[in-house]
Structure formats: structure tokens, C-alpha cells
């Protein structure tokens, strides 16, 4: 959807806009000042990013030399050290950390097979993040039970009476008809997040959940799940799409089939991790703070490259592009690399509550947490007038691929920042392949095209530049 359509759709709400009261934009003056020199500066950001590919180098270093960064793990600690050392080398005014209490869950053995009169098959599974183990944990007897397939919430309630003592197999696929893959992910995600407790209420002994991806392959996807209070905690595993399709077909004909599942995961004592913050002090409005961020933690199956190493690289490189260009910011700009997004947004909540000193205020917060895909645009939090605040920059960025402007979905981390009038923005890269790698062993550098990543960094840098340069302060 283009910005003109969005503004027309939101016209009825644009009269009372706290953000524009904070940062009124003189649109006529901006139109007159949209000079060749400004366009040339933006072009230089893209040229520098594509030529040097510094963000790609940082991402490769983080992915290859640090690797998976599950909260509380040794990789998480290594990532904090990596971020501090790397940001320290870039000459920002200060680099510091903020301690965050984080969850520490550890993966263990994970095996599964299905046996029936027609034979047996080993299946590709992985524990969902936060799952309890099967009986005996690593090396234990696991769980063996019949399987009931569930396709949708209505099907769950219709078949609930069949689930006692059985394994619930949640097999609702992501909707392939939705253009925005994140929307398809969101609609199908209830199975992973809440399926275990929903099935446990009917007496199920475990759940197996179809991986959240459009791709048909043998790679199971992990991701966070949660248990409801006062409901039995039962083991939860993700199963690859190929095996989910096979199991669904097999259940239609197999007689007396049994699923055997072993998960050795366990909950450990909480640990301390850190948000890592680099600050570039503003020249004229240093009390107004602009945040650009991604989350430093990742899941443990792959290298955390797409989720969210790419966002880390975007945040670091976007601000570095502006700094090395010689630009002097009006407002204080911060890179914030958030701790533990995957397991509860602990870092974002800590930063929102205690990350900013008295007398200062967030005015813009931008997040990248959708992978390294080529730029498509930005989403803006649904606050009256937010689209109007960035509409004048549409033509400046469209030539670089940023044509998709959406309301809502700025990002889970920056969404915790609720300063009055703050403009919350999410970077939108091409997402059609993102969920091929998301939360899997395939999330590594092989999934990244350096030019796509660098175009994203430059697009974020360009938008930050336009906002800082043209939005009038309080």
C-alpha cells in the first residue's frame, strides 16, 4: 500500500497527533528543500554500503565466530563481548551495557519415530523453546502414544474428547495465499505458542507442531512456547513440514500407529545478560533520543544470522554510515542491541523501564527483526499522524525499493518503548524466503545475499537522516 492510500485511510484520526505536536513537520518547506545535495547524500549512503559491505563483514563475524546466542548460554555472553568490542572500535561517544535478568533453557536429546503395521519412520523434530522434557530426559524412555491430528482451533475443540493419553499433532499450515509472510506466521503461530496447554486441558500427553514455514523440507523449526498456569506441562516439539505431510497422510491409513518422542531439554537457573548500547550525542537536541536496534540473542539450532544477526548488522551499519559520512546529528542517536527477545523481551523491557536518564525522551525508535531481505519499506506504529510524519520522504526512498509503507508492526523490542509521542518504525525487507530459515539449523550465512543486506542498512540510514534533518524539534 502506498503512503497516499494510507493517509487517506487514516485521515479521520490525523487531527489530534501527539507526535506532530512534539515534532511538527513543515511539509512545504521540506518539499522546497529536497535538493539535489540531499539526494546526493542519500545516494552516497547506498554507494558506500554496497562498495565496502561493512555490515556484511560484521554479520559474518557474529555468525561465524560467535554463532548461536540463546539467552543464558556461553554464546550469549560471547555476543555481548563481541558487540562491546566492535562498537568500541567505531568511535561513538560512549558504549555501555545494561544488565538484564534472562531465562536459561537448554536443549538436549531430541528424537522421534512413528511405527505402525506398515513399518516405522524416523522423523525430524526439535524441542520448542521452553518445553519440559519427556520422562527420563536425555536417554530416558520418552513418550509413546497414539496421535490425533489437529488442523485449526475448531478441530481442536471438536476432537478434544479424543486426546486423553494421546499426542496432539497440530498441523495447520501457514496460509500460502497471504502476501505478507509475517501475517501467515502470526495466524498459524497459536499452535506453537499455546498448543501444549490447550491440548493438555483435554488430557494430551505431548504435542507435535508443524513447523511455521511455507517451505517443504526436512528442517524442523523451534521457537518459544508457553504454559498456562495451573495446567499440566507437557512436552512440545516442532516437526519438519515434509514429515508433517507424511504423518498426516500416514494417519489416514495406519492402524494402531504409535509416535515415540524423546526430548532431553531442561530449564536452568536464570542468568545475567546485557543490552549493549552505543551513543552518538546530538548537536542541538541531545535530550531527544533516536534508537535503532535489533536483538543480539538468537535460537540455538543455526547461527542466528537472519534472526536477528541481520538486524544487529543493520542497526550498527546504519548509524556507522551516517557517522563516517561526516553528518552531524541534531538528536542523540543510539544503537541498542537488545538481550533475550526470543524468550520474553527481557532486554527491551529493561531498556524501556530504565535505559534512559531523567530529562531525556525517546522521539524515534526503529527496529530491524525481519531478516536480510532487500528493502521493501517501513511499518509505522498505529499512532494518529505517524504516516503523515514520514510521508514526505516516500519519493526519496522509493527509488531504492522502499515502496511498501504499512501501519502497525514496528517490532517487538521497540514496541516496549512507550514514551509519549515516540515514533515507532519497523524495517520491512523482502520476506518471501525469511521463514525458510527462521528458527532452524539453516539460519546461517549461506542464506544472506550481501547486497540485499547492505541495501537494508542504507535504507535505514537514509530514513534516520531524513527524520533527524527535517523534523522540527519541540
Segments (PLM) and residue ranges:
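A conserved hydrophobic secondary-structure block that centers on an alpha-helix together
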Residues: 152-162, 166-214
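Acidic/histidine-rich catalytic neighborhood of metal-dependent amide-processing enzymes
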Residues: 194, 272-275, 298-390
Amino acid at each position: 500500500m502506498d503512503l497516499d492510500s494510507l493517509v487517506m485511510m487514516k485521515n479521520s484520526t490525523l487531527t489530534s497527533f501527539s507526535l506532530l505536536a512534539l515534532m511538527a513537520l513543515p511539509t512545504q518547506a521540506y518539499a522546497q528543500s529536497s535538493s539535489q545535495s540531499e539526494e546526493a547524500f542519500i545516494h552516497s549512503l547506498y554507494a558506500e554500503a554496497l562498495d565496502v559491505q561493512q555490515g556484511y563483514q560484521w554479520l559474518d563475524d557474529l555468525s561465524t565466530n560467535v554463532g548461536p546466542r540463546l539467552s543464558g548460554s556461553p554464546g550469549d555472553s560471547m555476543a555481548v563481548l563481541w558487540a562491546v568490542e566492535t562498537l568500541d572500535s567505531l568511535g561513538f561517544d560512549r558504549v555501555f551495557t545494561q544488565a538484564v535478568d534472562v531465562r536459561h533453557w537448554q536443549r538436549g536429546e531430541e528424537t522421534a519415530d512413528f511405527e505402525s503395521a506398515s513399518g516405522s519412520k524416523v522423523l525430524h523434530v526439535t524441542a520448542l523453546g521452553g518445553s519440559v522434557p519427556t520422562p527420563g530426559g536425555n536417554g530416558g524412555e520418552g513418550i509413546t502414544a497414539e496421535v490425533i491430528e489437529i488442523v485449526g482451533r475448531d478441530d481442536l475443540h471438536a476432537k478434544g474428547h479424543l486426546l486423553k493419553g494421546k499426542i496432539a499433532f497440530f498441523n495447520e499450515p501457514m496460509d500460502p495465499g497471504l502476501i505478507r509472510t509475517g501475517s501467515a506466521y502470526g495466524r498459524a503461530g497459536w499452535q506453537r505458542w499455546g498448543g501444549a496447554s490447550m491440548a493438555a486441558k483435554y488430557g494430551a500427553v505431548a504435542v507435535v507442531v508443524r513447523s511455521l514455514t511455507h517451505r517443504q523440507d526436512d528442517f524442523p523449526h523451534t521457537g518459544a512456547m508457553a504454559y498456562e498456569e495451573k495446567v499440566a506441562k507437557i512436552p512440545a516439539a516442532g516437526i519438519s513440514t515434509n514429515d508433517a505431510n507424511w504423518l498426516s497422510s500416514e494417519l489416514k491409513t495406519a492402524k494402531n500407529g504409535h509416535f515415540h518422542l524423546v526430548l532431553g531439554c531442561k530449564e536452568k537457573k536464570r542468568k545475567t545478560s546485557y543490552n549493549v548500547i552505543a551513543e552518538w550525542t546530538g548537536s542541538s537536541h541531545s535530550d531527544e533520543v533516536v534508537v535503532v536496534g535489533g536483538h543480539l540473542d538468537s535460537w540455538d539450532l543455526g547461527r542466528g544470522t537472519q534472526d536477528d544477526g541481520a538486524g544487529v548488522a543493520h542497526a550498527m551499519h546504519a548509524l556507522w554510515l551516517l557517522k563516517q559520512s561526516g553528518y552531524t546529528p541534531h538528536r542523540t542517536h543510539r544503537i541498542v542491541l537488545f538481550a533475550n527477545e526470543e524468550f520474553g523481551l527481557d532486554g527491551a523491557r529493561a531498556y524501556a523501564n530504565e535505559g534512559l536518564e531523567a530529562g531525556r525522551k525517546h522521539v524515534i525508535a526503529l527496529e530491524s527483526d525481519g531478516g536480510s531481505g532487500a528493502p521493501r519499506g517501513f511499518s509505522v506504529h498505529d499512532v494518529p499522524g505517524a504516516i503523515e510524519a514520514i510521508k514526505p520522504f516516500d519519493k526519496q526512498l522509493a527509488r531504492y525499493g522502499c515502496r511498501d509503507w504499512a501501519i502497525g508492526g514496528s517490532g517487538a523490542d521497540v514496541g516496549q518503548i512507550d514514551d509519549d509521542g515516540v515514533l515507532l518504525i519497523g524495517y520491512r525487507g523482502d520476506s518471501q524466503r525469511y521463514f525458510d530459515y527462521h528458527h532452524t539449523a539453516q539460519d546461517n550465512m549461506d542464506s544472506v545475499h550481501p547486497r540485499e543486506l547492505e541495501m537494508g542498512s542504507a535504507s535505514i540510514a537514509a530514513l534516520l537522516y531524513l527524520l533527524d534533518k527535517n523534523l522540527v524539534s519541540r
